[in-house]
């Protein structure tokens, strides 16, 4: 897609080069010093030296709701000798916010001035001016104010802020952006009109256009500079990484069933494959607490009529979805749009457990696993075996 060269907030260089997959953060709390480059995908070092001891969770719900295997995460976070401090900053009392040691309110979009970037669609890009409508309520501060206060106490305020407020940074970045995008109006004009759009002057985006026109002069970022069918980099990884049984990394695009597949012996106990999907009433878990959206777009488990008939399940019946990791109670949607042997839950529903940890909100991550995908060490959210019964 076409995007505008709008200048963004500069970032300081992080002196720490060691990193892990975001999905592995619970493992880094539980067994950090055991995690290695060859077994766990640690980058920048052969192994982690220390576990995670503090979490700063800003405007995110990955602490609980959007992270796999909620019950395991809950147990890890219960022990405050492991992760000793959790700071959460948000506008809503999310599932993640309930696990905070320090919980701070963030300013809403209506309470501060900002730019909305990353707005592009096909051959058109746009920038939105998000103006302040009301003053921050009570003692709310913007995240820029919070981090500036932290920088002040750490002795690096000038290096961090460069002497600018949030609005002054916006004006500074906008002036730089006007040099790259001459069509931009003045700051005050843009503030009044609220949005700026620009179409791709080339008409439409052509993927890898320069490479296609001259592959020698414009190589890709692959080791060979070409589109690779056989990946030597993957071959090297497959030969050196320590993979658990069932995990496969191959230099060629091949089929591999993976763990918790229909071929897994666990299939006898949990015969249904549970997959997730992005639901129309939410962006992940954002808007998952809005009552009118929840009423208009009910959270349901989709199931094929053949699987439903075997279990005496009719459309709208309350069912229990369960495996060794947890249990969810939710209504069933019986539909031929699902393949036999497969059920589905829209991801992002807000976790709502009872006293026995049975979730009544339809949160798929009660049932997902924290076993990472083989290569990226990422979220295997569609790889879950479950059983379904009528309640």
Model-inferred region functions:
Residues 1-99, 107-112, 199-311:
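Extended redox/cofactor-interaction regions of prokaryotic respiratory oxidoreductases
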Residues 45, 62-66, 120, 132-141, ...:
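Hydrophobic alpha-helical scaffolding
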Residues 72, 99-102, 146-149:
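Alpha-helical scaffold elements adjacent to nucleotide-binding pockets in ATP/GTP-utilizing enzyme cores
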Residues 75, 81-85, 91-94, 129-151, ...:
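Phosphate/diphosphate-binding loops
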Residues 95-130:
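Flexible glycine/proline-rich, aromatic-decorated loop/lid segments
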Residues 125, 223-224, 268, 322-326:
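Short strand-coil-strand connectors
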Residues 139-193, 285-287, 291-302, 306-391:
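Long, contiguous, secondary-structure-rich segments that constitute the structural scaffold
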Residues 196:
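Conserved small-residue motifs centered on glycine
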